[in-house]
């Protein structure tokens, strides 16, 4: 089980990312657009640097929905490998069965 403070901090980061997402996309579009001038690019870079670090989606960590485990995360289920196995054996994941060949 992950510390509650780590889980809370990650949720706070998700909120910050959502709050700044539209503005970050606009600034990145200015940087990507070939028609933008050098001054526009520099201004966009400067504004991106002024934003909080936690506004970057890279800082958000995928965590298990049950216990917050950060490693061994499977996106399809939103669970770590440990909890995926437990849930599958208990029959709580429809359509998931133990492999045999």
UniProtKB/Swiss-Prot annotation:
SUPFAM superfamilies: Glucocorticoid receptor-like (DNA-binding domain) (SSF57716). Binds 16S rRNA, required for the assembly of 30S particles and may also be responsible for determining the conformation of the 16S rRNA at the A site. One of its GO terms (cellular component) is small ribosomal subunit. It comes from Streptomyces coelicolor (strain ATCC BAA-471 / A3(2) / M145). InterPro entries: Ribosomal_uS14, Ribosomal_uS14_bac/plastid. Keywords: Ribonucleoprotein, Ribosomal protein, RNA-binding, rRNA-binding. This is Small ribosomal subunit protein uS14A. NCBIfam families: PRK08881.1 (NF006477). Residues 38-53 have a biased composition (Basic and acidic residues). One of its GO terms (biological process) is translation. Part of the 30S ribosomal subunit. Contacts proteins S3 and S10. Pfam families: Ribosomal_S14 (PF00253).
């Amino acid at each position: 089980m992950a510390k509650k403070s780590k889980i809370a901090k990650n949720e706070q980061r998700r909120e910050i990312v959502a709050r700044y997402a539209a503005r970050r996309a606009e600034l990145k579009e200015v940087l990507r657009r070939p028609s933008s001038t050098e001054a526009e690019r520099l201004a966009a870079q400067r504004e991106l640097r002024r934003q909080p670090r936690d506004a970057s989606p890279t800082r958000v960590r995928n965590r298990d929905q049950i216990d917050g485990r950060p490693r061994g995360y499977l996106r399809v289920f939103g669970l770590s490998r440990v909890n995926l196995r437990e849930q599958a054996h208990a029959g709580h994941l429809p359509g998931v069965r133990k492999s045999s060949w």
